[in-house]
A protein has these predicted regions:
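Beta-strand elements of repeat-based all-beta scaffolds
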Residues: 1-16, 21-125, 129-203, 207-244
Length: 244
C-alpha cells in the first residue's frame, strides 16, 4: 500500500460492566488525548413478581489530564403501577429530566397516568404539552394518540377513564366521534392486524392510511383511498426469498 494512502482510523474504546452484567461505563479516546465518557447508573426495585433493574441516571463527560467536564445528564424517577391483579405491581417512569452541563433543565417529561399494564396514558412535556395515549388489545397496542387535551378532558369525552380502554381487545365504541368531541385536540387513531402489525392509521385531518400484509405477516403495501374510491399506493414491497 502506498505511504500516502489513508490508513484505517483506530479509535480505542473501553467498556465496563456492573456485577449484574449491565453496561456501567463506556469511554472513547479522542485524537487530542481527551476522552468522552458515558456513565450509566441503575437501581433495583422489588416488583412483587421479581426484581426490576431500572436505569436511573446517565451522564456524558469529557475527561482529560486536567479536565472533567459534564456535558449532559439524564435522570429518571419511578412510581408504582398496580396491575389488575392486586398482588402484582411494577415500577414505571414518573419523571424523565435532561440537563445540560451547567445543570440547566433542557427537557422534562412527566408520566402522570398509566394503565394496569404499565403503559403511559398521559405524558406532559416541559409542563406544557399534554399527550394522551389510549391503549387496547389488552394493553398491547396504542389505539389513539391525543395532543392538546388533558387526561380529564379526554375522560369526559369518552365517558370513562382513558386507562380503562386498555383492558378491551376489540375496537371500543367510545372512540367513535372522539375528534368531534375534542375539537381543539389532534386525535390520531390506530387499528391492528391480530398477527401482523398496524392495519390502519387515521390522522387528525381524517385521512386514513391502510397497511396490508402477506400470510407471513410481512408488509406488502400501504395505501390511501382517493375521493374516486381508488387506491393511492404509498409503498409497495416485493420480497424475494432465496432457498425457500
Amino acid at each position: 500500500m502506498p505511504d500516502n494512502d489513508m490508513k484505517a482510523l483506530q479509535v480505542p474504546e473501553w467498556y465496563e460492566y456492573d456485577k449484574d452484567g449491565y453496561l456501567s461505563r463506556h469511554s472513547v479516546l479522542k485524537s487530542d488525548g481527551d476522552s468522552l465518557v458515558d456513565s450509566y447508573t441503575r437501581i433495583h426495585r422489588n416488583a412483587g413478581y421479581g426484581i426490576q433493574v431500572l436505569p436511573s441516571e446517565y451522564s456524558h463527560r469529557m475527561t482529560g489530564s486536567d479536565k472533567n467536564i459534564l456535558l449532559k445528564r439524564d435522570t429518571v424517577s419511578y412510581s408504582v403501577c398496580q396491575s389488575a391483579n392486586a398482588s402484582d405491581r411494577w415500577y414505571v417512569p414518573q419523571v424523565v429530566t435532561s440537563f445540560d452541563g451547567s445543570g440547566k433543565v433542557q427537557n422534562m417529561k412527566e408520566y402522570l397516568h398509566c394503565d394496569v399494564y404499565g403503559n403511559p396514558t398521559e405524558i406532559v412535556t416541559n409542563h406544557s404539552e399534554h399527550i394522551i395515549y389510549l391503549w387496547g388489545y389488552y394493553g398491547k397496542h396504542p389505539v389513539s394518540q391525543i395532543k392538546n387535551a388533558t387526561y380529564s378532558e379526554v375522560g369526559s369525552a369518552l365517558g370513562k377513564s382513558p386507562a380503562s380502554l386498555s383492558q378491551a381487545y376489540s375496537y371500543d365504541s367510545s372512540l367513535a366521534g372522539l375528534q368531534a368531541r375534542l375539537p381543539k385536540a389532534q386525535v390520531t387513531f390506530y387499528t391492528y392486524h391480530p398477527y401482523a402489525g398496524i392495519s390502519s392509521e387515521t390522522a387528525p385531518d381524517g385521512k386514513t392510511t391502510y397497511y396490508d400484509y402477506d400470510a407471513k405477516g410481512w408488509l406488502i403495501k400501504s395505501y390511501r383511498t382517493g375521493e374516486n374510491g381508488k387506491q393511492e399506493i404509498l409503498q409497495l414491497n416485493n420480497y424475494h426469498i432465496i432457498n425457500e
